[in-house]
A protein has these predicted regions:
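Conserved "HGTGT" condensation-loop signature of ketosynthase/thiolase-family condensing enzymes
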Residues: 1-175, 179-186, 191-256
Length: 256
């Protein structure tokens, strides 16, 4: 019998966390705010200060709530990492040339709730009279709809993907994000979760969104919140040799 040597285990890869942004029912913010995301049941509301900083392009208010919280959290994470400027001045020709050669940024989100509440709201508009179906709701009846909104608003040109998870932990999205940085074409990946659950809900089904900006090599002069050590064989994450089974424990270590 021929015995073939086993392949050596894949080496761990270091990925830098350069941005963090979240929207929850308790608080909202980004990594430089020096505070932790706090999660609880209920429906999130987005502070006016955050809405004002994210306006630009299409009207924010026309989005369904699932998309609003997702786009807002992505924007906060990008601001934190230096890839999006709140209320920027009018673009010059140089700005436009720089934008054309911008860093390729991917967007990978997990979701457990998906856009189920928006689906139900849309169905209500067609129950009695299909001719009155709401096109404004129909465009948001996909879990990926808010990814397109975020890509347009923040000029993201990389890959985008929504991952459906049975439990909200974003582990699959984090793994895909690290794999994209290791083997893909994108230099930066924004990854996390977006959920909007029917109320009343119970833990861990917290409505809200949380996104991280991950980079293998720094593209901007920015703060590094933490170095995430990724084990591709086990699909596990570590910060300073402490295991992080999900995005919540990861943020606990990042925010201190």
């Amino acid at each position: 019998m021929t015995i073939f040597p086993s392949s050596p285990p894949a080496p761990r890869t270091d990925v830098m966390v350069t941005g963090l942004g979240w929207i929850s029912t308790v608080n909202s913010g980004c990594g430089t705010d020096k505070r932790k995301p706090v999660w609880d049941v209920g429906i999130p509301t987005i502070p006016d200060s955050i809405l004002n900083s994210l306006k630009g392009g299409s009207r924010f208010g026309r989005l369904d709530l699932f998309s609003q919280i997702g786009v807002a959290a992505v924007g906060l994470a990008l601001q934190d990492a230096g890839y999006f400027q709140a209320n920027p001045p009018a673009a010059t020709e140089t700005d436009r040339q720089l934008r054309d050669n911008a860093t390729s940024i991917a967007l990978i989100s997990s979701t457990t709730s998906s856009c189920n509440l928006t689906d139900r709201d849309f169905y209500k508009t067609v129950q009695n009279d299909p001719g009155l179906a709401s096109p404004g709701l129909f465009v948001y009846t996909l879990a990926t709809s808010f990814l397109g909104e975020a890509a347009l608003r923040f000029s993201l040109t990389g890959a985008s993907m929504a991952v459906i998870e049975p439990q909200p932990h974003a582990g699959t999205a984090l793994s895909f994000a690290c794999e994209e940085l290791i083997n893909g074409d994108d230099e930066v990946v924004v990854t996390g979760f977006c959920n909007l659950f029917e109320q009343p809900s119970v833990a861990p089904n917290f409505s809200g969104a949380l996104f991280l900006v991950l980079e293998k090599e720094l593209k901007k002069t920015t703060r590094v919140h933490a170095v995430l050590n990724y084990d591709p064989e086990a699909e596990l994450f570590y910060i300073k040799d402490q295991p992080c089974p999900d995005i919540f424990s990861l943020c606990e270590l990042i925010c201190g």
